[in-house]
Regions:
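Ferredoxin-type iron-sulfur electron-transfer modules in oxidoreductases and energy-metabolism complexes
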Residues: 43-203
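Hydrophobic/aromatic-rich structural module bridging two neighboring secondary-structure elements via a short loop
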Residues: 1, 5-45
Length: 203
């Protein structure tokens, strides 16, 4: 893994004293020993989620999250001259909402904290930050549907509104991204339904 020690690569996927990434809502690599009581016993474990199996010792396999990204967490572009970015104005509030979701580091703490092992917060963050920006519009209809389908295929559970994911997220990502994911998924599913012509009866 990256071993960045800056809280941005997500590879420090540990459960500290029963809480994914530790009790201070920061990444494990940014947790200081001074934050704990002198002489206390600290219990460090790997994540426990069926979709993220333990490889060895404290290392878990988070590649399922990468495959969810590969299913739709990208934008398409062409080579050669590109449109002027200034020609695509984005409202400040939309920009802030997109950037608040884009800070997800894919650490998997949300999955480890969820009683269902759900990756809805992670997937919702990726869908939200791309779907709100002009560059993400070409794949918007299919993105959420494809990513949720891959999430299900990887064995992640469904969301039942516990809210533990957002509570432990070191980037403090809001549950609002799950609402966006659900809305976009329904749109994608609706677009896949066959369109039937209404039968007209002869008068």
């Amino acid at each position: 893994d990256s071993d960045c020690r800056e809280g941005i690569c997500g590879s420090c996927s540990l459960v500290i004293d029963g809480t994914p990434q530790g009790p201070h809502q920061v990444t494990s690599c940014q947790t200081y020993m001074r934050d704990f009581v002198d002489g206390a016993t600290i219990k460090v474990e790997p994540y426990r989620a069926s979709a993220m199996p333990v490889i060895r010792d404290l290392v878990t396999d988070r590649s399922a999250l990468d495959r969810v990204i590969q299913a739709g967490g990208y934008i398409s572009t062409t080579t050669g001259p590109q449109p002027n970015p200034n020609a695509m104005p984005i409202a400040p509030e939309v920009q802030e909402q997109a950037m608040d979701a884009a800070i997800c580091i894919g650490c998997g703490a949300c999955v480890a904290a969820c009683p269902n092992g759900s990756a809805m917060l992670f997937t919702g963050a990726k869908v939200t930050h791309l779907n709100l920006l002009p560059q993400g519009q070409p794949e918007r209809t299919d993105r959420a549907f494809n990513m949720v389908s891959q999430m299900d295929e990887e064995g992640f559970g469904g969301c039942t509104n516990y809210g533990e994911c957002s509570r432990v997220c070191p980037q403090e990502i809001s549950l609002d991204v799950i609402g966006m994911l659900n809305r976009e998924y329904r749109k994608g599913a609706q677009a896949r339904k066959p369109k039937h012509r209404a039968k007209m009866t002869a008068q």
